[in-house]
Amino acid sequence: MKHILFTLKSCPYGLLDDEAHTRNVLVHAAHLCKSTLLGLSSHKFDPQGVTAVALLAESHISIHTWPEEGMAVCDVFTCGDHTIPEAGVQYMYEMFGATDMVSQEFVRPLR
């Protein structure tokens, strides 16, 4: 099981404040992780910001955006030898136009 926590920095306001874009990115990130998407939930805040969670058979992907700060706090958590969480992280970095990222990866033991 891999759990990658990451912060996307210096992202354009418009991408971070777009709920449809955020949902689309999570769907495609799940596919790139080789995971099975079970559900997707999101909320658009007023005046800005989006929170979204993709429920995966293998765990989850989440994002919480702060457009006014140019920042998104995210995680990709997958289990199974077939998954590639790094691919989802890279895709999210690219699709939110980040110019910097801080990340930390945890390998969670089963026992």
Go through each PLM region and give its residues.
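Polybasic/polar functional segments that serve as interface/processing modules
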Residues: 1-111
